[in-house]
Amino acid sequence: MLSSRAQAARTAADKALQRFLRTGAAVRYKVMKNWGVIGGIAAALAAGIYVIWGPITERKKRRKGLVPGLVNLGNTCFMNSLLQGLSACPAFVKWLEEFTTQYSRDQQGPHTHQCLSLTLLSLLKALSCQEVTEEEVLDASCLLDVLRMYRWQISSFEEQDAHELFHVITSSLEDERDRQPRVTHLFDVHSLEQQSEMAPRQVTCHTRGSPHPTTNPWKSQHPFHGRLSSNMVCKHCEHQSPVRFDTFDSLSLSIPAATWGHPLTLDHCLHHFISSESVRDVVCDNCTKIEAKGTQNGEKVEHQRTTFVKQLKLGKLPQCLCIHLQRLSWSSQGTPLKRHEHVQFNEFLMMDFYKYRLLGHKPSQHGPKATESPGSALGVQDTQAAPKPGLSQPAAPKTQFFMNGACSPSLLPALPSPMAFPLPVAPDYSSSMYLFRLMAVVVHHGDMHSGHFVTYRRSPPSAKNPLSTSNQWLWISDDTVRKASLQEVLSSSAYLLFYERVLSRVQQQGREYRSEE
C-alpha cells in the first residue's frame, strides 16, 4: 500500500496532467518544444561530462590472490596463454632480468629500436606481480609491435600457435644477443682504430690466424636451453660412433597410439621419443678395417655397409623444461586432425632415465645415503612436501624411472599401461637427481581450424616469502582469471607443459653435507 506522501504526489501529478490536456493545442506545442530544447541541452552536458571526466564508475581492482589478465586483441589468445605460462617460471624471469641488464650495459650509445627483452620482461614481471599494479587487465599489444619489428608477420584474422610463438621469442632473443659486439679481427683496421687504446697489461697475445670461436654465454645460461645426445652403434661389430649433441629449447613429443581402456602417460611419450631405431645400409669404418685386415696382398676392400642402432637421449637438461605434446595428426585422405586423448602427467617429473651418461660414469656418491622411507618429503628449496608414495614399490631398478603420469588414485584412476614397463601409482621422488616441478599448463580447446588457448599456472608467491612456490593454481582465459585445483590441472588435455628443476631430498642433504666439510 502506498504511503500518504506518495498518494499526495500521485494526486498532484494527475491534476497537472489534466490541466495540461485542457489547454489549447498552441500552448501544448510551445511547452513540448521547450521540453525538447531542455532535453537536448541536458544530453549535450551529459556527453561533455563523460568526455572530460570519463565514466562515473570506478575501475575494477584485481582480487587478492589473482594475477592480471590480458585483453584479447583479436585472436591473440595464443600469445596471452604463453605469456601467462612464461611468467609462472621464476628462473626464466630472473634470467631475463639479468639478460636485459647485461644487454643494456654492453650496448654502445642509445637504443635506436625497441628491445624484445625489455618489453617481454615488463609484461612478465607485471603478470607475476613483481611490479606494483592494481589493474585487472593488461594490454600486450606492445609485444606484437616488437615482434613485427623482428619481421614476424601476424594477422588478427588468422589462428596462431602458442608453441610457434615460443620458438619465435627464443630465437628473437638469440638474435638480440648476437647484436652485441664480438671480438674484432686483426685485419679489421677500421674497427681497431675506433677502439680506445688498451693498457699494456691488457694485451696478452697476437696471432696471425683467425681468432678461435668464443663460446656464447647466452646459450650456456639460457634456462630453456638443453642438449640432445645421439649416437649410433653397429649391430655387427658393436662399434659406437662419436656422440653428437644438438641444442633444443623445447621437447616436441609425439603421442603414441592409445589402447582402448588404457590411459596414456607422459612417460609413454618420453619413452617413444628416445626409443632406439634401426638405420640400414650405413657404412661402418670399423667393419671395413676388420675386413681389410683379413685380406692378403693389400687387396682393396669395399666399404662394408651394415645396420646401425640409433639411440637418442638428453645430454643436458635445462633449468626450465618446455614439453610440447604434438596433437596434430593426418588422416588417410591427407586432412589435418587434432588428437584429443588425455595424456596423464604429474606435478613432479623425474627425468633420470632419459638423461645421457658417459660409459662407466656413476652418479655422485658425496653426502650421506638416503635413509628415509619411500614416503619421505622433497627437500626442495621452499621446503614443500612431495606426494606420499604408496606402500608397494617396484623391485626392478629400472622401473623406478617410469613414474611420470601415474597420478594418485584420488586424482586420476590408476589403470594398467599399454606398454611393457610398469607404472607405480605414487612414485618416490626423494632419490631423483633430475627432478622437475610443474609450473604451468597451456591447453587448446577446439579443432585444427579454430579454437581457444587457456592457461593453468601457479599463483605468484607471497610478498613475505618471495622464494617459495605457491600451491594455489589459477585458470586464465585472456582477461578472465579464477582459482583452480590441482585435480583440475592434472585432468586437463595439455598442449604445453612448463616444468622447473628443483632439488630432491638426497641432493639437498648432499649440499648440506658438503657445506659442513
UniProtKB/Swiss-Prot annotation:
- Ranges per topology, Cytoplasmic: 57-517
Pfam families tied to this protein: UCH
Q: Which part of the chain holds the cross-link Glycyl lysine isopeptide (Lys-Gly) (interchain with G-Cter in ubiquitin)?
A: 235, 289
- EC supergroup of this enzyme: hydrolase
Q: Where is the USP domain?
A: 68-502
Classification via InterPro entries: Papain-like_cys_pep_sf, Peptidase_C19, Peptidase_C19_UCH, USP_CS, USP_dom
In this entry, the parts of the chain located on the Mitochondrial intermembrane side of the membrane are 1-35
Organism superkingdom: Eukaryota
Segments crossing the lipid bilayer: 36-56
Q: How is its activity regulated?
A: Inhibited by the diterpenoid derivative 15-oxospiramilactone (S3).
What Gene3D superfamilies does the record point to?
Cysteine proteinases
In residue numbers, the region (Disordered) covers 364-395
Report the GO molecular function annotations: cysteine-type deubiquitinase activity; cysteine-type endopeptidase activity
What this chain does, per the record?
Answer: Deubiquitinating enzyme tethered to the mitochondrial outer membrane that acts as a key inhibitor of mitophagy by counteracting the action of parkin (PRKN): hydrolyzes ubiquitin attached by parkin on target proteins, such as RHOT1/MIRO1 and TOMM20, thereby blocking parkin's ability to drive mitophagy. Preferentially cleaves 'Lys-6'- and 'Lys-11'-linked polyubiquitin chains, 2 types of linkage that participate in mitophagic signaling. Does not cleave efficiently polyubiquitin phosphorylated at 'Ser-65'.
Family that this chain belongs to:
Belongs to the peptidase C19 family.
* Protein's name in the database: Ubiquitin carboxyl-terminal hydrolase 30
Gene source species? Rattus norvegicus (Rat)
Gene that produces this protein: Usp30
